[in-house]
Amino acid sequence: WIGTAISCGVAAGILIGFVGLWWYGESQHNWFVTVRDTMLRDARLRALGSAQLFAALAVPAAIFSPIGEELFFRGVFATIVTMAAGPVAATLCTAAVFGLMHIFHHGLVMSSAGLELQPFSAMAWVLLTAGLSLMFTWLRVHSGSIWSAVCCHAVFNVTMVAFIVIILGK
């Protein structure tokens, strides 16, 4: 299952990155652009070379979010909803909440006018991250282990960071 998790994470990261470029170019409506801009608010990160920047961003992206989010969403949250409403409802509810939570990475954007909602790209981002949630759940269920979902999530995040550093640049 690890090979499947790695393949799914890489494919999803590349696909979502290029969909953003195709639809929105390098504008603030592109989810990876706003993620990049958020990551690079710190001048110390902007001063790093590409390899150092990749390492500085990829290591925490591969560890903290995947472990914390998967233990919560595919572990605690899905278990509670499954007991209350069954596995299909749990899968759909988990995907919806996971997708909506990620609006804080893209969709609600800080601009010179203050906090702005970008409704169309935000909706696309929420649906894409809900789709990621479905993929993580599928891996969790079919492998019998939450660690396949953690692995896929980590690989997706690292692929996203690589896409940001290599394709979008600083």
Each model region followed by its residue ranges:
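Juxtamembrane helix-loop-helix connectors linking adjacent transmembrane helices
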Residues: 1-65, 83, 113-121
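Transmembrane helix-loop-helix hairpins at the membrane interface
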Residues: 38, 50-170
